[in-house]
Amino acid sequence: MSQVILDLQLACEDNSGLPEESQFQTWLNAVIPQFQEESEVTIRVVDTAESHCLNLTYRGKDKPTNVLSFPFEVPPGMEMSLLGDLIICRQVVEKEAQEQGKPLEAHWAHMVVHGSLHLLGYDHIEDDEAEEMEAIETEIMLALGYEDPYIAEKE
């Protein structure tokens, strides 16, 4: 199985207590090599201000969000392994984990898995797309040793 090249950027005012680079690498490797051979992904961990600004600029949503995915569009005729960028907001991930009663590490893993699937072209706008994407996320999370991230919604 091929490995994903990770460019990890920690852009928080306080970077203590964040997952280790090896964890981010493990989470990426659980997703992307299943779908494509060589890949490069940037993960940028940010504070709420940067997440808010990017979410407003690119999605028209006036609030920070947990993860933003920016797939790289390779020009026709060029071969590049760059898959795209994930922007993950530390404070939103921490708040959601607490509100949802999930272990923080599991929620970080879920955000990487979820965002990676977006980079690979998956979406959850339509119900059938959401079901397919959530099924893949659940399978990957279970393989990583975490609980189904959607268990509360299914009960």
From Swiss-Prot:
Cofactor names from the entry are: Zn(2+)
Q: Does the keyword field hold Metal-binding?
A: yes
InterPro entries attached here? MetalPrtase_cat_dom_sf_prd (IPR023091), YbeY (IPR002036), YbeY_CS (IPR020549)
Major localization listed first in the record, in broad terms: cytoplasm
Q: How is the cofactor bound?
A: Binds 1 zinc ion.
Report the locations given in the UniProt record. Answer: Cytoplasm
- Give residues annotated as binding Zn(2+): H114, H118, H124
* Task of the protein: Single strand-specific metallo-endoribonuclease involved in late-stage 70S ribosome quality control and in maturation of the 3' terminus of the 16S rRNA.
Q: What is this protein called?
A: Endoribonuclease YbeY
The organism is: Escherichia coli O81 (strain ED1a)
What gene is this protein translated from? ybeY
